[in-house]
C-alpha cells in the first residue's frame, strides 16, 4: 500500500511538472520575460525581478534603479495588490506618470491571467546582489567615462572575448532631470539646440517632402507631426493619428510623390491616405497586413522601409525572447521543409517569423521571408544611393559585459545572421550548443560591430537636401549617424550617445566615431537616451531623445 501511495505521488509530481503552462505563464513568457525574471534571487534585467511581487511595496527591490515616479509612489505607500497591479498594467503611465514601463496590457483577461501567474511566484526570496558592485566589466573599454566627440572605435570580429568573461549585470539606468544648462557635447564647429521638447517617449522620426517631421509614440498609440517655420525650432506640434496599437515604424509611399503614410503597429501594418502638408489623418486607416506573426510579445518594435523602386516593403520583426531557449531542438516540420517556407536559419515555436526581416509587395500581398537571425533589427533603412537594405541590431544579453557586440550591417536576401544559435559569424551561443551545427558556416559576419549592449535603435544616411542652408561638411556625406539608446545589461554603463559610422562607397568600413555624448551623469543616472536620428530639410541632424522627451538639433556653427 505504501509503495502504491509513493508511486501515485511520483506520478502526480511528474504530471504537474509536464503540465501545459497556464495562460498567465504563457503570456508572461511571450510578453514580459525579456525584461523581468521571476526567480527567487530577484535577478534584474531591464526591469526588476517580479518574484513575490503580489503584495510587495512598489519600488522595493534593493539595488534596482527605479524611476523617481515609482520610488515616490512606493514611499507614499503604493503596494502591488492584485487590484493595484491590474490598474497599473492597464495603463502604466496613467497610473504612475513618469514610470519607465513602456506599454500596458489592454485586455482584462490577459491582465487577470498574468497577475494570477505572478501570484504563484512567491516564497522565500534570496538577497539580490548589487549589479554594479558584482558585475564589473573586464576593462574600461566602451565605458561612458571614456566618451567624447571624436573618439574612434573599431571592434574586430576576430578579437571577441569568451562568453561569461564577466558577470551579467542587471543595471538599468535611473532617468534624472537634465541639470540646468546641461547640453549634449558635439564636435568643434557644430552647435546643438532644442528643436522640440515635452514630447514624451517619441521614436523614429520621418521627414516629409515639405520638411514636416513625423514621430511615433508607442505608449500613447499615436503619431505626431512637428513643423518649423525657420528650421531652428518646431512651432507646430499636431497629433496626426490616435488609436493605434504600439505604433513604431513609418514610411511614406511612393517616395517621390507620397500618397500614403504607412504605420507599423505591433502586429499589423496600416496606411493613411496622405497629401504633402497634412497635419491630421484623413479618416480611418486601411489595414495592409492584418497579422504580422502569431506572437507579438518580447521585442515589440516593427520597422518599415521600401525598396528604392518602391515595389517591395520590408518589415523587421524582433525576437519574442532573449535567446529562444524554449523552442526545442527541431521545428514542427522536417528542417528542409521548414526552411523552404521560412528561410535559412528561421526559428520556430514562439519565434516563428520573429528575429527576421519579411518582405511584401507595397499592398501587403506576396508575403515572403527575406533574411533571418537578426535578433532585433530596430533600425532599418534602404540606402538612398545603393538601394541596399541595412539593419542596426540589438544583440542578445546575459553573456557578459562585452559580448556579443551589437552591430550595423547590410542585409542580403536569403542570408542568416546568427540568432539564436550563433553570433558575429561562427561563434556558437553556449546556451544552445550543438543544436544547429549546419548553420555554423552559413552565419554572416556583420559589417560594423558596436560596443556590446549599446542598443542601436535608429539610423540615417547623411545626405543633405539640395541647397540646404545648414548642410554638414562634405566629409560627412554618405556616412551613417546611429543613435545608441544605452545599456542595462552591463556593469559599467555604455551608449547614450550618437555615433558616426564610416562608409566607403556605400559600405561600412568597420569603424565608428563618437559624435554626440554627455548624457550620462554617473553609473546610475542618465538625463537623456538617444533613440533615433533624421536629417532635417535644412541639413541639420535631428536626434530624438525619448528619455528627456526632446528632439535635439545639431548644425554646423556657420550656415552655408
Language-model features, listed with the residues they occupy:
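Sequence/structural segment immediately N-terminal to covalent heme-attachment motifs in c-type
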Residues: 20-42, 50-51, 114, 196
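Gly/Gly-Pro-rich "capping" loops immediately C-terminal to redox-active cysteine motifs
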Residues: 25, 37-82, 102, 239
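C-terminal capping alpha-helices of c-type cytochrome domains
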Residues: 79-130, 541, 546-547, 556
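Beta-propeller domain segments
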Residues: 134-188, 258, 319-368, 375-518, ...
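Surface loop/turn motifs at the tips and blade-to-blade linkers of beta-strand repeat domains
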Residues: 194-199, 239-245, 288-296, 369-373, ...
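Hydrophobic core register within WD40 beta-propeller blades
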Residues: 205, 250, 304, 377-380, ...
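Conserved beta-propeller blade signature
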Residues: 212-216, 259-262, 312-316, 388-392, ...
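Asp-box/WD-like beta-propeller blade repeats and closely related beta-sheet repeat scaffolds
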Residues: 237, 246-247, 251-253, 267-309, ...
Amino acid at each position: 500500500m505504501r509503495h502504491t501511495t509513493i508511486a501515485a505521488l511520483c506520478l502526480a509530481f511528474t504530471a504537474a511538472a509536464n503540465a501545459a503552462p497556464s495562460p498567465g505563464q504563457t503570456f508572461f513568457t511571450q510578453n514580459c520575460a525579456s525584461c523581468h525574471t521571476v526567480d527567487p534571487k530577484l535577478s534584474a534585467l531591464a526591469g526588476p525581478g517580479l518574484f513575490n511581487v503580489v503584495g510587495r511595496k512598489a519600488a522595493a527591490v534593493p539595488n534596482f534603479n527605479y524611476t523617481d515616479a515609482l520610488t515616490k509612489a512606493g514611499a507614499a505607500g503604493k503596494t502591488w495588490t492584485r487590484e493595484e497591479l491590474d490598474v497599473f498594467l492597464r495603463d502604466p503611465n496613467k497610473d504612475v506618470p513618469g514610470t519607465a514601463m513602456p506599454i500596458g496590457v489592454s485586455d482584462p483577461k490577459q491582465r487577470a491571467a498574468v497577475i494570477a501567474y505572478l501570484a504563484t511566484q512567491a516564497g522565500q526570496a534570496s538577497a539580490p546582489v548589487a549589479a554594479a558592485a558584482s558585475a564589473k566589466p573586464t576593462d574600461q573599454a566602451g565605458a561612458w567615462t571614456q566618451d567624447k566627440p571624436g573618439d574612434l572605435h573599431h571592434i574586430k570580429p576576430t578579437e571577441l572575448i569568451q562568453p561569461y568573461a564577466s558577470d551579467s549585470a542587471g543595471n538599468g539606468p535611473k532617468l534624472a532631470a537634465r541639470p540646468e544648462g546641461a547640453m549634449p557635447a558635439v564636435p568643434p564647429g557644430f552647435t546643438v539646440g532644442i528643436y522640440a521638447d515635452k514630447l514624451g517617449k517619441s521614436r523614429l522620426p520621418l521627414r516629409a517632402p515639405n520638411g514636416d517631421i513625423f514621430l511615433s509614440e508607442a505608449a500613447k498609440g499615436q503619431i505626431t507631426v512637428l513643423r518649423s517655420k525657420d528650421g531652428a525650432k518646431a512651432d507646430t506640434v499636431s497629433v496626426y493619428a490616435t488609436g493605434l496599437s504600439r505604433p513604431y515604424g513609418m514610411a511614406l509611399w511612393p517616395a517621390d510623390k507620397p500618397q500614403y503614410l504607412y504605420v507599423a503597429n505591433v502586429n499589423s501594418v496600416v496606411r493613411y491616405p496622405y497629401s504633402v502638408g497634412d497635419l491630421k489623418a484623413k479618416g480611418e486607416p486601411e489595414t495592409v497586413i492584418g497579422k504580422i506573426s502569431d506572437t507579438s510579445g518580447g521585442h515589440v518594435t516593427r520597422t518599415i522601409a521600401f525598396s528604392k523602386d518602391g515595389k517591395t516593403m520590408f518589415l523587421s520583426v524582433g525576437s519574442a525572447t532573449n535567446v529562444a531557449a524554449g523552442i526545442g531542438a527541431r521545428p514542427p516540420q522536417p528542417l528542409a521543409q521548414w526552411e523552404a517556407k521560412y528561410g535559412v536559419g528561421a526559428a520556430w515555436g514562439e519565434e516563428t517569423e520573429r528575429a527576421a526581416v519579411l518582405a511584401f509587395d507595397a499592398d501587403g500581398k506576396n508575403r515572403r521571408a527575406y533574411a533571418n537571425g537578426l535578433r532585433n533589427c530596430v533600425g532599418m533603412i534602404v540606402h538612398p544611393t545603393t538601394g541596399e537594405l541595412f539593419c542596426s541590431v540589438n544583440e542578445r544579453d546575459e553573456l557578459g559585459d562585452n559580448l556579443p557586440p551589437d552591430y550595423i550591417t547590410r542585409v542580403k536576401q536569403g542570408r542568416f545572421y546568427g540568432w539564436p544559435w550563433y553570433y558575429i559569424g561562427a561563434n556558437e551561443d553556449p546556451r544552445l550548443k550543438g543544436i544547429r551545427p549546419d548553420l555554423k558556416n552559413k552565419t554572416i559576419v556583420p559589417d560594423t560591430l558596436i560596443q556590446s549592449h549599446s542598443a542601436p535603435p535608429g539610423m540615417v544616411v547623411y545626405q543633405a537636401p539640395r541647397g540646404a542652408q545648414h548642410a554638414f561638411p562634405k566629409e560627412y556625406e554618405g556616412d551613417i549617424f546611429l543613435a545608441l539608446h544605452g545599456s542595462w545589461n552591463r556593469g559599467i554603463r555604455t551608449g547614450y550617445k550618437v555615433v558616426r559610422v564610416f562608409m566607403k562607397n556605400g559600405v561600412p568600413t568597420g569603424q565608428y566615431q563618437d559624435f554626440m555624448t554627455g548624457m550620462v551623469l554617473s553609473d546610475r543616472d542618465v538625463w537623456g537616451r538617444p533613440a533615433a536620428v533624421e536629417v532635417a530639410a535644412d541639413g541639420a541632424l535631428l536626434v530624438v531623445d525619448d528619455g528627456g522627451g526632446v528632439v535635439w538639433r545639431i548644425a554646423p556653427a556657420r550656415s552655408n
